[in-house]
A protein has these predicted regions:
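Active-site/ligand-binding surface loops and adjacent short beta/alpha elements
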Residues: 159-183
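Extended, loop-rich substrate-binding clefts of extracytoplasmic carbohydrate-active enzymes
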Residues: 70-71, 75-129
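Coil-to-beta-strand transition motifs
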Residues: 11, 115-119, 126-133, 145-147, ...
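Short, solvent-exposed aromatic-acidic interface loops
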Residues: 108, 136-143, 169-175
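Acidic (Asp/Glu-rich), glycine- and aromatic
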Residues: 24, 135-164
Length: 183
């Protein structure tokens, strides 16, 4: 049976222990201590390693966007652009354990410069066939932009480099970025 370990700081997936013939292997690349995660997430060159990322995963060009004809100005934290937001630095309340881990938090109107009060619910669900499902639910009391992701990094061997590992994505479309990797 697969096992997942999480931190309520940043909703981080810290470990995924996968059963193998040689025993469990941790396939997650992460940090050892909470202080390491805090240092990473507060750094200008943060990897957001293992974290739940938002309010807007990816970059917002020139740190400005419009909703309903109104311009919203964000912190330029990645050159002249805005990257990811502060969800990785939030403390999430753990609501349930077991095969389903439920974590919740709120994001007040104006946090990071975004409109709307958000209620955030993140579920990490471990299925009977050793699959991990991530279910995000967010409600807002105002029109806003939202783009969520999880920033877990994997090494399927559990250690060493990943240069011989292959990833295949079955996607009919993808979003290209400009020279600053902004959509």
């Amino acid at each position: 049976q697969m096992c997942i370990r999480d931190r309520n700081y940043g909703c981080v997936i810290k470990n995924i222990l996968v059963p193998t013939k040689k025993g469990p292997v941790d396939v997650v690349v992460g940090h050892d201590t909470l202080a390491d995660y805090e240092n990473d997430f507060n750094s200008q060159s943060s990897t957001c390693c293992g974290a739940f990322v938002g309010r807007y995963a990816n970059r917002i060009e020139n740190a400005v966007f419009s909703v309903g004809g109104r311009a919203y100005h964000l912190e330029a934290n990645n050159g002249k652009n805005h990257l990811h937001g502060t969800f990785p630095r939030k403390i999430y309340e753990v609501k349930s354990f077991g095969d389903t881990l439920l974590l919740e938090a709120e994001s007040p109107d104006g946090e990071d410069g975004f409109p709307g009060n958000l209620k955030i619910s993140v579920r990490y669900i471990l299925t009977e066939d050793n699959a991990l499902r991530m279910d995000y639910r967010v409600s807002s009391d105002a029109d806003t932009v939202l783009n969520l992701t999880n920033h877990t990094y994997f090494n399927l061997d559990g250690e060493g480099d990943v240069l011989n590992q292959k990833l295949k994505l079955y996607a009919s479309r993808y979003l290209e970025g400009n020279n600053e990797t902004c959509p």
